[in-house]
């Protein structure tokens, strides 16, 4: 947790809440605790999660399991975009291998398909959808770290956030925090498309401007 706090890693789904602090909040709550991953990627023109999941899925799975281990989550729910059947099929195959080798003995992993609703990018809307309800935002407080999925304390991350967890633990908090511009820390991934010379997924320092 301290390593995550020192790294400056924040939630990369839009809210930007400090990752280490979120882990600490969830871990302080009563058990059982849960975890939810938002892989719905419903924002127009965004495809960075698909890029990472198809090119380095193990890095995503390792980061997810590390986070689940830290907060002692009994179950992880992966909320995946329905338009990504290739990703879902491949991840299920890899998770089966994990289970066969007893690499996730303390954590059960579940898949749920999103319906592509943009609103479910908001964390509490995703929780409602996971529970089989209409994906509408909840009133806060209480926050998901206190009362989340099925009424249990829940750690919520998006794909890109957990993607950096393993890298930070391998290279250290200083490595990640040494990147960044204009008062920001870390690295960010951008989906570049449209009438540009070099479309695709681009990695750049946090805080970089369009001109730069």
Q: What are the residue ranges of the model-derived segments?
A:
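Iron-sulfur (Fe-S) cluster-binding modules
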Residues: 1-6, 73-78, 107
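Conserved alpha/beta core surface patches that mediate binding of polyanionic ligands
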Residues: 7, 12-30, 50-56, 170-175
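Short amphipathic, charge-patterned alpha-helical segments
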Residues: 63-65, 207-212
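Hydrophobic alpha-helical positions that pack around
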Residues: 88-206
């Amino acid at each position: 947790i301290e390593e995550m706090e020192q790294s400056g890693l924040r939630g990369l789904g839009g809210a930007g809440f400090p990752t280490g602090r979120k882990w600490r909040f969830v871990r302080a709550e009563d058990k059982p605790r849960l975890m939810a991953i938002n892989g719905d990627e419903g924002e127009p023109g965004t495809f960075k999660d698909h890029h990472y999941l198809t090119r380095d899925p193990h890095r995503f799975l390792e980061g997810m399991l590390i986070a689940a281990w830290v907060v002692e989550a009994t179950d992880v729910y992966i909320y995946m975009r329905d338009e990504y059947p290739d990703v879902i099929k491949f991840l299920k195959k890899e998770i089966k291998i994990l289970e066969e080798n007893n690499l996730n003995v303390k954590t059960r992993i579940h898949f749920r398909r999103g319906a592509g609703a943009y609103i479910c990018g908001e964390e509490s809307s995703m929780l409602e959808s996971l529970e089989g309800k209409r994906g509408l935002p909840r009133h806060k407080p209480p926050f998901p770290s206190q009362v989340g999925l099925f009424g249990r304390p829940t750690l919520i991350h998006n794909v890109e956030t957990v993607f950096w967890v393993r890298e930070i633990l391998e290279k250290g908090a200083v490595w990640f925090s040494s990147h960044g511009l204009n008062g920001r820390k870390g690295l960010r991934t951008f989906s570049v498309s449209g009438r540009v010379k070099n479309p695709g997924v681009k990695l750049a320092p946090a805080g970089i401007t369009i001109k730069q």
